[in-house]
From Swiss-Prot:
GO terms for molecular function: ATP binding; serine-tRNA ligase activity. L-serine binds at T231, A232, E233, E285, S383. GO terms for biological process: selenocysteine biosynthetic process; seryl-tRNA aminoacylation. It is an enzyme of class 6 (ligase). Pathway: Aminoacyl-tRNA biosynthesis; selenocysteinyl-tRNA(Sec) biosynthesis; L-seryl-tRNA(Sec) from L-serine and tRNA(Sec): step 1/1. It comes from Helicobacter pylori (strain HPAG1). It is found in: Cytoplasm. HAMAP family: Ser_tRNA_synth_type1 (MF_00176). Consists of two distinct domains, a catalytic core and a N-terminal extension that is involved in tRNA binding. Catalyzes the attachment of serine to tRNA(Ser). Is also able to aminoacylate tRNA(Sec) with serine, to form the misacylated tRNA L-seryl-tRNA(Sec), which will be further converted into selenocysteinyl-tRNA(Sec). This is Serine--tRNA ligase.
Length: 415
């Protein structure tokens, strides 16, 4: 959540950030401006009534001590108190309206984030490893998976519905091996391995920004205040919800393997075949909580950590700086890692490493204490990596002409 003080003091800065995101709030934004104007006016009036109450109360005390008639002052105090209570209630209601609007306003766009109107304006930063030149037409992963008997898409539909799959046989061993490899690499880079619940309450999803705005994107348990997590970002970040951390304990670096669940609202017709876009998928996540001065360096560290895994698996990939219009709700700056898929003849996202600055920390009340003063921390998150998409990339990049898959040396010891 952005700072309410910033909204009150520099409304135009917030409006400009929304414009950079190509985020249309239109009349809603103007109504918010009107509410803020009304709130400021009432706040000044409230402060005046409070000052008057304090002044008259002092006079009342002096006259009482002097045993002078105070009946007029008493009546004045009582009348003013009624006005004070009514206005205080009105100001409180306006604050609630502002905070409700604040909860659905996305993060401010970072100065480093380039302006853009769509994902077409994202900027390639660098490429790592050169894509292989095939002497045959490479197949897509779902063809290879079915040929090798590794992924059963029909059973996924039978057990649940479309966008679910069953991984079996040697494919399941590769899937498990990838998870272990990812966790080992992340641990080597200083991230603590943590296993968390796959269900969280509403407060946790508010903390990381999924609620209230993206309610349609998550699965809710019927008759329970519980939701299936869309990412371990939710659980890892919220381990420190409403917590004050000693500055000496920063940075906090965590990694977790979890199943993730997403409704994929708005994705009809996209990636309908294969494992690219599933309702349930596994992901190994990185989350960091840092001092406000250290989050930029941490973002670079997290990117390199994820890239290290792809290099070990001999998978060509690139870093892509997202433009302002392609940023996620909570992100101030995001760099994607896209892996090369020869079967599709394109790069596809396999990780997004985002710096949310103090946006999530303000929502979740994650603070650190330095020099006896509490400050908002910065939080970062990123995949390291999406397991299914890594398996997709492994199959497509290391396929042989007969449909068999070469296993990279780094993965051999996990099989």
């Amino acid at each position: 959540m952005i700072d309410r003080k910033l909204l009150l003091q520099d409304f135009d800065k917030v409006a400009l950030s929304l414009k950079k995101r190509n985020h249309a709030m239109g009349d809603e934004l103007e109504r918010l401006r009107e509410v803020i104007t009304h709130y400021k006016k009432q706040l000044i009036e409230l402060e005046g009534l409070q000052a008057f109450q304090n002044k008259v109360s002092k006079e009342f005390g002096i006259k009482m001590a002097q045993k002078v008639d105070t009946s007029d002052l008493k009546k004045e105090l009582e009348n003013n108190k009624i006005k004070l209570n009514e206005l205080s209630k009105s100001v409180g209601e306006l604050e609630q309206q502002i905070d409700l609007k604040l909860s659905i306003i996305p993060n401010l766009v970072d100065e480093k984030t380039p302006l853009g109107a769509s994902e077409e304006d994202n900027i390639e930063i660098k490429k790592i490893l050169t894509p292989r030149v095939f002497t045959f037409k490479p197949k897509e992963h779902f063809e290879l998976a079915q040929q090798n008997g590794w992924i059963d898409f029909e059973s996924g539909v039978k057990l649940a519905k479309s966008r679910f799959s069953v991984i079996r046989g040697f494919g399941a061993k590769i899937y498990r091996a990838l998870i272990h490899l990812m966790l080992d690499f992340n641990e080597k880079n200083g991230f603590e391995i943590i296993y968390t619940p796959a269900l969280v309450n509403e407060k946790m999803l508010f903390g990381t920004g999924q609620l209230p705005k993206f309610k349609e994107d998550v699965f809710k348990i019927e008759n329970e205040n519980l939701y299936l997590i869309p990412t371990a970002e939710v659980t890892l970040t919220n381990l420190y919800n409403d917590t004050i951390i000693g500055v000496e304990n920063l940075p906090i670096k965590m990694t977790a393997h979890t199943p993730c669940f997403r409704s994929e609202a708005g994705s009809a017709g996209k990636d309908t075949r294969g494992m690219i876009r599933q309702h349930q998928f596994d992901k190994v996540e990185l989350v960091a909580i840092t001092h406000s001065k250290e989050s930029d360096a941490m973002q670079e560290h997290m990117l390199e950590s994820a890239s290290e895994i792809l290099k070990a698996l001999e998978l060509p990939h690139r870093f892509v700086q997202l433009c302002s219009a392609d940023l996620g709700f909570s992100a101030s700056n995001t760099i994607d890692i896209e892996v090369w898929l020869p079967g599709q003849n394109c790069y596809r996202e396999i990780s997004s490493v985002s710096n949310t600055r103090d946006f999530q920390a303000r929502r979740a009340k994650i603070r650190f204490k330095e020099n006896q003063k509490n400050q908002l921390a910065h939080t970062l998150n990123g995949s390291s990596l999406a397991v299914g998409r890594t398996m997709v990339a492994l199959m497509e990049n290391h396929q042989q002409e007969d449909g068999s898959i070469h296993i990279p040396k780094a993965l051999e010891k996990y099989l």
